[in-house]
Amino acid sequence: LYRFPVVFPTDRWQSVMPHELATWGAQDKRFWSEYSTDGRWRHCMTHAPVPVDATGRRTVRLFGGRKAIPREDNGGLCQPESCPEYQQRQCNLTGRFLFFIPGIRSISAFELHTRSFYAMNAAIRTFETVAFLRGGRLAGFLDRQGTPFYLTKRLMEVAHIDDQGRPVRVPQWIIELE
């Protein structure tokens, strides 16, 4: 598929395109990013230490799983340029679009995963522009005629910095939101 119609289930772009920078250990995530409620600040999170009982010999059973806390050694802010894990390519960007396809019955939303900064950055700009023009609305059709958004993929030349620090342009298929 190169182009198909989609509608989004909610008005928050952070909910229809959840994404994070994450560092994985052998068994689970060690560090991950979470956005502030306004979507402007990325916070670096980690798991809180598991508490022990009064004797100090047994861990306390945690209801609802381990608690997330801001990472202490960076003040809780996610700043990839100064992050040792990001610089060593241990921390990577992942995201997904959550949507419905008009005419296809489904109880749960479809997901389209991406690891492209370019796709997610352009989608955020589109979401913010459309939400501004529609009084904050992203969910549903764009107008009374049932006009949907479209997800496409386009072959684009994107730049990245190679291991020697030189800018290099390479072709890459990028998800695009229309």
What are these regions (language model features)?
Residues 84-178:
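Extended serine/threonine-enriched, polar tracts that run as long, contiguous segments within proteins
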Residues 1-105, 162-172:
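OB-fold ssDNA-binding interfaces and closely related basic DNA-contact patches used
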